[in-house]
Curated annotation (Swiss-Prot):
PROSITE patterns: RIBOSOMAL_S9. GO terms for cellular component: cytosolic small ribosomal subunit. InterPro entries: Ribosomal_Su5_D2-typ_SF, Ribosomal_uS9, Ribosomal_uS9_bac/plastid, Ribosomal_uS9_CS, Ribsml_uS5_D2-typ_fold_subgr. This is Small ribosomal subunit protein uS9.
Length: 130
């Protein structure tokens, strides 16, 4: 018999996380590494555990994540979004709790493009009066 996985896709900035959850002992693996090894900063580790701690599923679900693109902060946000969607697929009653915490909503902020004649997206070239 096949193992029953629940799936969720999470996105943040340019990072995309594919999250698979199944009943287990609370092991989180990100790109075939333990989450504590993959995310070097404590804030990243804290962000990915937020939806699990909120719903009380931090010790009874195994999570496998494949992630591509972005930096460490964007990847952590994408994993959180993916875990949230997978938890909703796992148990529909958790949706109200997770949406009140703001985890269901996709953070749509992206990097603004650089404009022609500017140094950065909004930073203009230095003006010289003389």
């Amino acid at each position: 018999m096949a193992i029953q996985y629940n799936y969720g896709t999470g996105r943040r900035k340019s990072a995309v996380a594919r999250v698979f959850i199944k009943s287990g002992t609370g092991v989180i693996t990100v790109n075939h590494k333990p989450a504590d090894e993959y995310f070097s900063r404590e804030t990243g580790r804290m962000i990915i555990r937020q939806p699990l701690e909120l719903t009380g599923n931090s010790t009874n679900l195994d999570i496998m994540v494949n992630i591509r693109g972005g930096g460490e902060s964007g990847q952590a946000g994408a994993v959180r979004h993916g875990i949230t969607r997978a938890l909703i697929d796992y148990d529909e009653t958790l949706k109200s709790v997770l949406s009140k915490a703001g985890f269901v909503t996709r953070d749509a902020r992206e990097v603004e493009r650089k404009k022609v004649g500017f140094r950065k997206a909004r930073r203009r070239k230095q003006f010289s009066k003389r």
